[in-house]
Curated annotation (Swiss-Prot):
The protein's name: Large ribosomal subunit protein uL13
Source organism (scientific name): Baumannia cicadellinicola subsp. Homalodisca coagulata
MF term (GO), any: mRNA binding
SUPFAM superfamilies reported for this sequence: Ribosomal protein L13 (SSF52161)
HAMAP family: Ribosomal_uL13
Extent of the signal sequence: none
NCBIfam families: rplM_bact (TIGR01066)
Stored InterPro entries: Ribosomal_uL13, Ribosomal_uL13_bac-type, Ribosomal_uL13_CS, Ribosomal_uL13_sf
GO CC entries: cytosolic large ribosomal subunit
Origin superkingdom: Bacteria
Transmembrane regions listed in the UniProt entry: none
Function in brief: This protein is one of the early assembly proteins of the 50S ribosomal subunit, although it is not seen to bind rRNA by itself. It is important during the early stages of 50S assembly.
Amino acid sequence: MKTFTAKLENIRRNWYIMDASNKILGRFASNIALRLRGKHKVIYTPHIDTGDYIIVLNAKKITVTGNKLSDKKYYHYTGFVGGIKEQNLKDLMTKRPEYVIERAVKGMLPKGALGKAMLKKLKVYAGTEHQHAAQQPQVLEI
């Protein structure tokens, strides 16, 4: 018996909608990462992108446990001397709630070109409106 390897021309990608309302950030992000990688499919192959497209709605309503709203810090470097900036989760959720979910999922995907291709299939929106009705996405309850 030979080992099965998925081929790009045989992969069917589905579109799913996930609602982030009252979901815990880490658990929600790990479920998204699993589906973006395609690990829920029988044809999963580690070096080929077999995952589906995920649309996340209501990113501004996601929750975290404990004191993470005030304690969790997000850092970025501007490129200048002394230019490291920090922002806590509460401030980031008011300005860019989509980024919080994207960053959590990005950390759970492979690093490199394959992970970047997987992350492009993630579409995150702060509210309930999205522009992917033509793809006829299915609602995915978790």
